[in-house]
Structure formats: C-alpha cells, structure tokens
C-alpha cells in the first residue's frame, strides 16, 4: 500500500521550519518507519547537504524523528533499498530531478514506495512525486535527462500555489501557466496546493490537511475551488492516456 505525505511548503511566513509538517510527519511515521529514515537533500542549492540534514533534524527532534542524508552513503541506491522511510526536501526541482536521475534513484524509490515504504516530500519533494516536473515553480538552472519524475501519483501538484499575481505584477499569473499546462495535457489533473496544505495518501484514500482550499485544474473544464474536507479521490484515477506530452 502506498503511503505518501506530500507537503506544499516547509514553512509559511512567521512559522518555524516544518512547523505544520512536523506533527503530520509524527502521525504519519510509525515506530518501525523511524529506524532508517533517508533524507534526499539534492534540491539544496545555497547551503550544503550537511546543513540541510541538520536543519531537518533540528525541526523534527521534538517528535523523535532523525533523518540520515543520502549524500553520506557510498551507494545511494543500496541506501534507498534499506530505508524504512524516505523524505525528499524542498529546494530547486530541476537540480533535484537531474541529480536523482544521474544517480539512478528514480526506479529504486518508486519500487520502495510500491512495497509500502512511506514517502514524504515538501515543495520540490512533492513535485518529484508527480508524473513530471512540469508544474514546478522553479527556474530551470539544471538540465535533467527528462521531465519524467517518480510518478507516485497520477496527477500534478503545483506547490506554493498562488491564484493572484503580486501587486504591480504584469507578467503571466500562476493560474494562466497552469491553464496552459492542462490545455496542452488535457487528461492530467493539476492540484494547486496552497501553502500550509498537505496531501495524505494511503492506498486508494486521499485527504487534505490544512485550512486552505485546493484549486483543481483539468483540460476543458472550469477550475474548481475545493475545501479540504472535499472528496479528492478522483485525483488518484489514472488518466485516460498514458502520460503528459
């Protein structure tokens, strides 16, 4: 049974790091899950992987959760195969994807999740759980082998979702860019996941944690604003065609 906790962001303004996600991770991870938690830190750009691991451990220490950076292992594929839980941190989705592909991590992580190993990611870490990275907000500062990512879910997430442009902004809005995506890929749902929101997926059940609505996009349909208490099960249905263009 797949077990996923997909988080929009690590912290909102005025919050400490993983303030909202920490309690959810505590509920999400069993005692057995905590034996060997691997953190994939490759989205970090302006700070070191060691600093990233330290920051995550400091935030999760009150919950008795300790992570081990994947970068510290000589054989990262073997480390993934031995993991009891996998966390993928935020940062730049393009760099994260390129590094995961180069190290041959996509299939081992996919296999681990299919075997029931819990997976949680925030921001870029939720992006790579999708079929592709096409709905990331990040600048493409690295070139991956392809846009294909883990495909742990059949829909796309846009984390840090904002439906309104900042005051004085004259460029494309997030809303317009996602409409472009679903126009080009009409069978793929996109969930605009506002900050402070998380998807919890266990098997064929999905729910939203957080107070904010989720905006749903689908080709040829009006966008929908759905309350966190809504039925999101349709997002887990496989699209009628195999994958996005």
Which ranges hold each PLM region?
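C-terminal and late-domain segments of enzyme folds
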Residues: 1-34, 40, 47-51, 135, ...
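Portal/gating segments that form or line small-molecule/metal binding sites
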Residues: 38-39, 43-101
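Catalytic nucleophile loop
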Residues: 87-90, 113-132
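N-terminal glycine-/serine-/threonine-rich phosphate-binding loop
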Residues: 1, 16-19, 27, 61-82, ...
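Structural motif
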Residues: 6, 38, 85-89, 120, ...
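Alpha-helix C-terminal capping/helix-to-coil transition sites in glycosyltransferase folds
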Residues: 81-82, 115, 152
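Catalytic-core regions built around general acid/base machinery
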Residues: 102-116
């Amino acid at each position: 049974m797949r077990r996923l906790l997909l988080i929009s962001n690590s912290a909102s303004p005025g919050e400490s790091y993983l303030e909202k996600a920490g309690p959810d991770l505590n509920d999400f991870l069993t005692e057995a899950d905590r034996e060997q938690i691997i953190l994939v830190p490759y989205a970090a750009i302006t700070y070191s992987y060691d600093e990233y691991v330290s920051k995550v451990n400091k935030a999760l220490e009150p919950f008795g959760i300790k992570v081990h950076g994947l970068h510290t292992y000589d054989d990262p594929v073997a480390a993934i195969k031995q993991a009891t839980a996998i966390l993928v941190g935020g940062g730049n989705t393009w760099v994260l994807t390129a590094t995961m592909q180069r190290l041959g991590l996509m299939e081992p992580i996919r296999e681990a999740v299919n075997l029931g190993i819990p997976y949680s990611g925030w921001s870029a870490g939720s992006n790579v759980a999708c079929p592709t990275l096409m709905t990331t907000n990040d600048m493409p500062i690295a070139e991956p082998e392809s846009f294909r990512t883990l495909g742990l879910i059949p829909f796309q997430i846009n984390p840090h979702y904002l439906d309104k442009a900042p005051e004085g902004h004259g460029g494309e809005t997030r809303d317009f860019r996602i409409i472009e995506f679903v126009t080009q890929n009409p069978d793929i749902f996109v969930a605009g996941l506002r900050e402070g929101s998380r998807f919890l997926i266990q098997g064929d059940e999905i729910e939203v944690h957080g107070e904010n609505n989720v905006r749903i996009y689908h080709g040829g349909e009006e966008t929908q604003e759905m309350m966190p208490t809504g039925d999101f099960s349709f997002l887990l249905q496989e699209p009628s065609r195999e994958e996005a263009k």
